[in-house]
Amino acid sequence: RDIFWNPKKGFRIIQSFIPMLGENEFHIWNQSFSLFLPYSKTVTLALNTTMQKKYGYKNDVWINYFGNSFNIRGWKLPKKGSSLDNFRFGHEFIFSSFEVRKIVLSEKASVLGLSKGLCFVGFIDGGVINKNWDDINMDNLIGGAGIGVRIPVPILQSIRIDIGWGIKNKMFNKNYAVHLAIQQKF
């Protein structure tokens, strides 16, 4: 896999096991599988699936949510009064993302030997989350779709700006959400 700001071909597998020790001990097992396929010289198809399983103590302090720039895009951040029982919250999840990445500006800069570029992206995300793996079902499936831009930045890889619309029950949300992040989603 190309490890720079915009991978063009190859694959990446990430596994992590995170122990949270103490009075209310738990362990998190994360898995991420990514595939990058060159479609043309300037277009890359990128696919990712990420899963999380949590073992041990589960409470609402360490709960995860869908709707940020690193999982299901197109959803606004949850409000403070959001119910933790809703379809966007849980401890265990699986989600997938598909991106079409198109380089629209690519050149080598002579200033400090840094590369410049600009990449436009179309994306579709989808996944399910729940408090327990056994309770995960397709009735809680949510998604997001949209477009974005990637601006390469030395050391940080890239600045990522995405605009998306959430999808639930085969209907798009009326309002869009803007997500700003550093690095590619995967």
What spans do the regions from the language model cover?
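Active-site scaffold segments
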Residues: 146-152, 160-162
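One face of beta-strands
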Residues: 31-33, 143-147, 178
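C-terminal outer-membrane beta-barrel translocator/porin domains of Gram-negative envelope proteins
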Residues: 1-118, 130, 182-183
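Conserved active-site loop/cleft motifs that coordinate metal ions or position small ligands
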Residues: 121-123, 157-164
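Short, contiguous acidic/charged loop-to-helix segments that flank catalytic cores in large enzymes
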Residues: 82-89, 132-140, 167-170
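Outer-membrane beta-barrel "beta-signal"
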Residues: 151, 175-186
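A structural signal for short secondary-structure junctions
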Residues: 90-92, 111-118, 122, 139-143, ...
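Outer-membrane beta-barrel transmembrane domain signature
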Residues: 99, 103, 119-145, 154
